[in-house]
Amino acid sequence: LAKELGNFTDRVRLVARNPQRVNETDELFKADVTNKEDVLKAVAGSDVVYLTIGFEYNLNVWRKNWPVAMQNVIDACLQHKTKLVFFDNVYLYSKEAIPHMTEDSPINPPTKKGEVREIIFKMLMDAIEQKGLKALVARSADFYGPGAKNSLLSIGVIDNFIKGKKAFWQSDADKIHSMTFTPDAAMGTALLGNTDDAYGQVWHLPTSQEKLTGKEYINLVATAMNVKPRYYILNKFLIAMIGLFSKQVKELREMQYQNDQNYFFDSSKFEKRF
């Protein structure tokens, strides 16, 4: 995102606990997003804030930190009259919406993590509707590509093939699963943030509309890496067993519904507009 913003401005401030420069001209600002004063100082002088933070993939951490962080950012943007772009995921959609997700899909999350995402989304929409915040939501499907080290495609397929191991896929490799390419997500987020009439709306970031299955992803990666497309399925039983030893895998259990069925992310609204 910092690279893409270079197409629109030469003044980018990177805010994190330990920020690292991406562009030579980047300004670095150390802050804790759960600290109100830190956020107020970080936002000061900005035209647009891009909220792209990720907390540890842990329900208790999300419940504790996300509402505080969102409120701090909303308050800072209102105080400094700054626009806000919130980079979001699909966890708040209903289970029934997953086979064909659009910006108008019903919000009824079937998981505890999804409930946290619904809370912070509603906080943002309330601030837009009741307090005059100028903001938008840029929503992504599961990622692949540069920087997506924790994605299913990276951990389950690419990393294992590099190590000479079998790949794994979660639940069912015959189901469709949309994936957003990280450079496309960055490009789309930067473009939305710099498009005045995009504000006040939810946008799905540009994502390939090819309906590829897990098996097809595995075959594509195997062909590119010149290895055999060997894989196994990480089913509910295996997740439960591995979850006894791995917190990260344990946290995947409640998200299984996204892999038990087709998962198609429709980004045609973005593609028609841009």
Placement of each model-derived feature along the sequence:
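Mid/C-terminal beta-alpha module of Rossmann-like enzyme folds, strongest
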Residues: L1, G188-L252, S267, K272
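Conserved Rossmann-fold NAD(P)-dependent oxidoreductase catalytic core, especially the SDR/UDP-sugar
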Residues: R13, Q71-E118, L136
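NAD(P)H-binding glycine-rich loop region in Rossmannoid oxidoreductase-like domains
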Residues: R17-H80
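Short-chain dehydrogenase/reductase
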Residues: R63-P67, P99, P110-K122, S151-I155, ...
